Amino acid sequence: MDFLGQRMPYVTAFSKALGTGMMISADSPIGDESRSAMESLIEDYERVLSRFRNNSLTATIGKAEHGGSFDFPDWCAPLFDLYDALFSATSGAIDPCVGEDLIRLGYDASMSFTVTQDAPEHLGALRGRATWGQDVERHGTTLVTRGPVQLDFGACGKGYLVDLLGRMLRSTQFVIDAGGDLLIHAEQPISIALEDPEDSSRAIGVAHIVNGALCASAPSRRHWNVAVNERTQIAIHHLLNAIDGLPAQQTEASWAYIPCNPQHFNKLHHTADKSANATPDIARNYPAAVADGLATALFVSEVAQLQRTFDFAYATLNESRQIAASRNFPAELFLRSA
């Protein structure tokens, strides 16, 4: 990001947030009181939604042998609304219940990266895994289950936390960077290198953002190898199609962009809106969450299918290193088009 240190010299870091860390660059200092409030929000967020914390509400649902009724905080409502929309728009390919598949494939709380022996018989909704649409009954921010359900809110959870933190900033200009997922409010464009998934020291393009959210997904960020036999290993990553429970193929990286009206940042919100059911409202109020979710969805759904529900700009890189992008994607791209 060009000259960011000069334009936004005040940096606040949350090194352990969501496992990837978060960094806020701003044109004015973030005071101790604001930083403390942000730290409290991050702690509450993980205590509720992280499947990697044994004491989280999400982990409790996964251990409830007979299910139950689980009350989430009001600030979860827009996140659940977004998952409703993504589940519908992708015909179930994006589903929080994919947590069970991730665990069977080795992406569990202990990071064992060891596939369970029974995984082939149980992966995906096609083989009977629980689904958001059927096995999790939602009443606002209350989720009702009839047995243990392993939920994972990683598809858009990081972006949603970025949005909530952005609502707490009084700065005129800021950039929130959560492991490459960005929320930007600036007076002049910020230039951002689009990382090459094959070599993090290279870029396949440069985006230019003034106000908006730009989020990326790539298997290269989180993958592991599993031995089939003494001679053969297969690569597994965390971007799964929830229908069959298998890692998505053919796409190497994706980027999704949601623009923001500058007025969006001029209002101070300490908590999430309790109702944001309409998809345009979700995108307007939680652009990073939507961009995060769509960057994941681009691995498992056709663009045209997603565009029936969401208005967004995108770019994708396929296995042949050809890039496809919408005309309104705000970037210079260095590779040939698909």
Residue ranges of predicted features:
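Mature catalytic core of soluble alpha/beta enzymes
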Residues: 1-338
